[in-house]
Each structure stands twice: as C-alpha cells, then as structure tokens.
C-alpha cells in the first residue's frame, strides 16, 4: 500500500514496513530510507535512531530534510550525522 510520508514514518516507529507513492520514502520496519540513503535505524534494544541530515554541514537535500523531519517524530534518539 502506498502511504503519505507522515504515515511511512509512523509505521517505521511501529516497526512495520511501508512506502510512499513513489518509493522515495520507505521503511522495512527496521530501517528508514530517503531514496537510497538510510536516515533511520533500529538498534538491538528496539530504539529508533534518526540521522539528522538537516544539520549544518550534513545537509543532503530538501526532500531528505523533510523525510528526516517526519522520522524525528518517531525517533528515540537523534544523531547529528
């Protein structure tokens, strides 16, 4: 099922797979991807970790920044990448 971006991030937070309409933002339940860049992961304790590609010097793209923003809402840990 093709979902809205905020729902993709929510499904990652629930450890479920999901994808948006064109596959540019997706989760396999463990990792969260913006295009082919892994922006989120799940550690051995089940904590959701988001890599902050919006920070100064680590900016990737406008779209990836939006995807990171959605992921932050469901992350336990935010890493400055």
What label would you give each PLM region?
Residues 1-81:
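Terminal leader/tail segments of proteins
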